[in-house]
Amino acid sequence: MLRETLEQLFEFVAQHIPSEQIMMAKKEYQKTTGEIYEDDKSYNSRMALFLEWYLLDQYEPGTRQTVLENIIEDNSSSWTPDRLESYKDVSKNIQALFEIKKVRDNSVTVLDLFTDEKYQIEEEDSKLAFRKNDIFQGRIVPHNDKYFFTGYFCFHPKKTQLYIKGEAKKFYLLQRSWKKELTKLEKESSKIQKLYLKNAVSIEKIKTKIERTDSGTKRDKLTGKLLGLKEDKIKIEASSQQTGKEIGHLKLEKMKIEGRSLISELINKLAYMNLKWERSRQIDVSDIYRN
């Protein structure tokens, strides 16, 4: 079913997006993956990987949405709920370098080398396609509380595993630093919200006291306190807005956009190395997979 959904999306791209735009994207893609020729053994799978990249990793100029996210937004009113839901599932895909940890008859357990998270993937006849410790480029898509492969892969030779894991770890460490920063900002935001609530309660108490007092002197003192609390409220609100902006920037610009870009860049670089190896088997693979 997922393969059919992707084929529908590929067909939609072919019918509704100008061919010049797709050709420009292909040239951009091939800057890091190498030019694809029809006589390459992996031509079909690499073309599918390009279309996945175009739909799922390429951002529309001037937006913070991928091509697929824009397509969904533009057509949400004309598609059936089921179709819309299946496309939204695809937009939530996880692209990674995966390592096979366990192979069962109809599922595999994989480790995402970028996040160190494990996933159980539903996959028919998995023992025919995967072996334990395989490392490969792929995407998984969530659907009905399960995960599925998109079906397009780039498997890397066993001798390259040490190099690939070293490259993936660089991103893992960067992402971990972003998560630590996010946790710190979220704690700060929580602290600010508590201050805001405490300030609001204090303001209401002072207002009640002012209403109940008959003493002019006491009322003046309470009014002064109220003004101070209102000034504090303005400062707290400003801090809350600033922290919210920092959290939003970190989540969108760093963790989503820059994170996806760095993952895509590394995966495409490795795919190009794999293509060189495919074309030149007489060269030792360790002379290809290197910085």
Predicted segments, located by residue:
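C-terminal helical accessory/scaffold domains
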Residues: M1-L56, Q242, E246, K251-E258, ...
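Short, compositionally biased
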Residues: F149-K165
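Short aromatic-glycine-enriched beta-strand elements
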Residues: N106-V110
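Short nucleic-acid-contacting surface segments enriched for D/E, G, S/T with interspersed K/R
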Residues: E123-R139
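Accessory interdomain/linker segments of ATP-dependent helicases and helicase-like nucleic-acid enzymes
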Residues: I17-K101
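Short, charged beta-turn/beta-strand-edge "cap" motif at the junction between a beta-strand
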Residues: R139-K146, F153-F155
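A short macromolecule-binding patch
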Residues: E117-E122
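C-terminal effector modules of nucleic-acid-centric enzymes and ribosome-associated factors
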Residues: F149-T150, E167-N291
